[in-house]
Amino acid sequence: SDLVVKYVSARNKSKKRKVKIPKNKWLKNYLEASKREDIDIVIELIGGSDGPAKKLVFNSIKNKKHVITANKALISKHGDELSKLAEKNRVNLEFEAAVAGGVPIIRVIKEGLTTNTISKIYGILNGTCNYILSEMENSKDSFLNVLKKAQNLGYAEPGGAKFDLDGSDALA
């Protein structure tokens, strides 16, 4: 069946966007997504391990909504609890985009390697650092200039990319 975007929410509804969003698609409050009967899947892109993102994801799962998130901080801090809650409520919690710079590895590990024991995984675990290092090498530009470019492109957190750059992101 086709994917239909029923509603959207954002901190700043008046922000200029590349797509036009009809007024009737905007939710008055982001938590409405977790309660509405006509919503099956909630996609969380808020960010942060607590606050609005945590509230939305927990409420959605409790209300039997499938959840998709790219939120590393949330999964790192609350992943075990969220997974158990999703299993209890018989819904999916999908977070592949939150891991290893978006490399599609979670499903392979969960479904394809269940009888094997994984002791180590080597690879690029942080897409932001990978982008910055590759761009510095290719463009010969400075770290600060490339970081600013990464922030403008949305690859690094604006204002303070500490989580992206100090290793805690990859540790998550």
Question: PLM ranges: what are they?
Answer:
Residues S1, N12-K16, S34, D50, ...:
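Structural signal for hydrophobic packing residues in well-ordered secondary-structure cores
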Residues S1-N63:
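N-terminal glycine-/serine-/threonine-rich beta1-alpha1-beta2 phosphate-ribose binding loop
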Residues V4, N29, D38, P52-L56, ...:
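General structural feature for long, well-ordered alpha-helical segments within catalytic domains
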Residues W26-K28, I43-E44, I68-A70, L93-A97, ...:
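General beta-strand structural signal in soluble alpha/beta enzymes
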Residues I46-N63, A70-K110:
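Rossmann-fold NAD(P)-binding glycine/threonine-rich loop
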Residues N63-H66, G127:
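Glycine-enriched alpha-helix->loop->beta-strand junction motifs that scaffold or abut catalytic
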Residues E111-L171:
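Conserved anion/nucleotide-ligand pocket segment
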